[in-house]
Design a protein with these regions (language model features):
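Glycine-rich beta-strand-centered segment in the early N-terminal region that forms part
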Residues: 62-76, 89-138, 143, 151, ...
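N-terminal Rossmann-fold NAD(P) dinucleotide-binding loop
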Residues: 239-240
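Adenosine-nucleotide cofactor-binding segment
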Residues: 226, 232-235, 247-313, 334
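Short, flexible surface segments
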Residues: 116-119, 213, 226, 321
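Short Gly/Pro-enriched turn/cap motifs at secondary-structure boundaries
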Residues: 35, 60-61, 94-100, 172-177, ...
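Glycine-rich phosphate-binding loop and adjacent beta-alpha segment
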Residues: 250-251, 261, 268, 273, ...
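C-terminal hydrophobic helical "lid"/dimerization subdomain
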Residues: 4, 20-40, 289, 296, ...
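NAD(P)H dinucleotide-binding glycine-rich loop of Rossmann-like/cofactor-binding domains
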Residues: 131-233, 281
């Protein structure tokens, strides 16, 4: 999560715009005759121009359609992917848009076909769907829903339309099926996880994206074994979450690799035991140094930056015979990776991508929350700042300046 947090969420063939998207359809759906629900007028932070401060304004939020849930947001946290898309002038960037995808809230109303949650339930919205019906969701081998695949569409997953408009009637686009920088949002029920309401919301909201991605990559994707050696390329928020996951799995040596030595002190709190400054190795490559430190290679290597060159370095220093390289950061779409075919054949290594840490949202997020209540998963150390939603642009500045890990914003404080 260094070069591009946004691209840590992308897969190589991402769908940018839903072909069914119709700007006029939202104008026809701002009320729901089937349920009698009406639009809600509320406050939102709207991205009006790329890279410029978000505009705090009042918007209208339509009632939920059949399989949708309207949520009152309690608090939301800021992720680098929000920052990256906020700057984008070209697709998948689009304005006006409501960003935000790490949040927790309370169900205000549900569509007529929703059975899974009800009004008053506490829920976490997620950018990953878990429909519970498709072949992928029914399998324990994948967390990639084929019915509602991951996309950066500006609309809802089922019909591509939006549930937001401003007070002038102009449509406002969604982001990652969540759009949490608003007091109320509408999310498909496939992207909603019911959670224990007693868990502090300023901690539970972190599991919508970043922390789950890193911890899950160590736990679910890599299946890190007790006593193993782990190398993490990039120790920003995602890399630190990987370290936390590796610590929970019992790894004994966790090596953090970054160009900023100042990060090591913070990384120690997350379980990182050794540090390598990749910018001060002289004539040696990072992979050479890691191979020397681990007597032949780390059992697990995690690439959390988004540079193809680091994927190669990570693969080069994972142990032959059983080493795994897990890719969490992906460079710009179209970037290529190339490997010597004989190395692939002879070395017995595994290279795998990990979206949302391989977690199934509806079954695995509750497990992570249980680990938190059992004082195993330490969420507190990820939160460096808390503030009012009104100060969201201050939160952006903190992230831009590299002064925060996670900044949580409360809607009513």
């Amino acid at each position: 999560m260094y070069l591009s947090m946004f691209y840590t969420l992308l897969v190589p063939c991402v769908s940018i715009l839903n072909e069914n998207f119709s700007p006029t359809s939202i104008m026809e759906n701002m009320s729901s005759p089937a349920t009698g629900l009406q639009p809600i007028r509320c406050k939102a932070a709207v991205c009006r121009k790329p890279g410029e401060p978000l505009v705090m304004e009042e918007i209208m939020v339509a009632p939920p359609m059949g399989h949708e849930v309207r949520i009152r947001i309690i608090c939301t946290s800021l992720c680098h992917s929000d920052l990256i898309v906020w700057k984008m002038k070209d697709p998948p960037g689009i304005v006006p848009r409501i960003l935000g995808h790490e949040a927790i809230g309370v169900v205000e109303s549900v569509g007529k076909d929703v059975k899974e949650v009800k009004e008053g339930d506490t829920v976490i919205p997620t950018f990953m769907a878990d429909c519970g019906e498709c072949k992928d969701c029914l399998s324990n081998k994948s967390n990639l829903c084929s019915k509602f695949p991951f996309s950066v569409s500006p609309g809802m997953p089922r019909d591509g339309t939006t549930r937001f408009k401003d007070l002038n009637g102009e449509i406002i686009n969604h982001f990652l099926f969540v759009s949490s920088f608003t007091e109320y949002t509408v999310v498909d029920v496939a992207n909603v996880v019911k959670v224990d309401p007693t868990i502090p919301p300023n901690r539970a909201c972190l599991l919508s994206c970043g922390v789950s991605t890193g911890v899950g990559a160590a736990w679910r994707t890599a299946n890190v074994e007790k006593g193993s050696t782990v190398a993490i390329f990039g120790i920003g928020s995602i890399g630190l979450a990987v370290a936390e996951g590796a610590r929970l799995c019992g790894a004994t040596k966790i090596i953090g690799i970054d160009i900023n030595s100042d990060k090591f002190e913070t990384a120690k709190k997350f379980g990182v035991t050794e540090f390598v400054n990749s910018g001060s190795l002289g004539n040696k490559s990072v992979s050479e140094v890691i191979n020397e430190m681990t007597d032949g290679g780390a059992d697990y290597c995690f690439e959390c930056v988004g540079l193809p060159s680091l994927v190669h370095e990570a693969y080069a220093c994972c142990r032959q015979g059983w080493g795994k390289t897990i890719v969490l950061g992906v460079h710009k779409p179209g970037s290529q990776l190339s490997f010597d075919s004989l190395d692939v054949l002879h070395l017995g290594k595994t290279l795998i991508g990990s979206l949302f840490g391989g977690l199934k949202t509806k079954s695995d997020i509750p497990i992570l929350l249980k680990w938190y209540t059992d004082k195993k998963l330490e969420l507190d150390k990820f939160v460096t700042h808390e503030m009012s939603f009104e100060d969201i642009n201050k939160a952006f500045n903190l992230l831009i300046e590299g002064k925060c890990l996670r900044c949580v914003m409360w809607m009513n404080k």
